[in-house]
Amino acid sequence: MAPVKRPIAACFMLVLFSFGQLLSAQEKSGPCPQPIVTNDSRFRPGQVWQYTTRSHEKASTLTILKVESLPKQGVIIHIRVDKVRLRNCTGGPEPDKFQHMPFTRKVIERSVTKLVQENGVPEFKDGYDEWRKACGGVYTITVAEAINVGEETFRKNLGCPSTD
């Protein structure tokens, strides 16, 4: 089973980078601006939140990984999302988490509903480093909307029919 998960994980990472049209991009005319770690009055690394989920994922939660700021985007909240289900029409593994997703603070504010607990911060270095290397953007749509787009992209890359 483990050998199958590695290609799925690689495919899934590509999914995260393939819908950049929904992201507020960083300036790419020169080197990427260096994010500045920021303290926020409400959001802190390790917090686990309930959020407005997709209808079939009521148990899904998001975890705050890091809080930073960039000149054009303002405060960025990096999150992990657990207990999602990305449907796989091939019968293969179905990803159940997004390990790193950067959002504007405004979108996280609109998405979260209840602070559940505070834990340690799960590992997210690989996803974060890929985001930095790509001068990646920041989601400006809700968490649930981003998961919908991620699932559609995942399914399209597998050759699955659209769920529209």
Label the predicted regions.
Residues Q26-R87:
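N-terminal secretory signal peptides
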Residues A10-G20:
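Bacterial N-terminal signal peptides
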Residues M1-F12:
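Bacterial N-terminal signal peptides that target proteins for export
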Residues P7-A9, P35, V116:
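Hydrophobic alpha-helical segments and their boundary regions
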Residues L86-D164:
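Beta-strand-rich cores of mature extracytoplasmic or soluble domains
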Residues Q21-A25:
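Sec/Tat signal peptide C-region and signal peptidase I cleavage site
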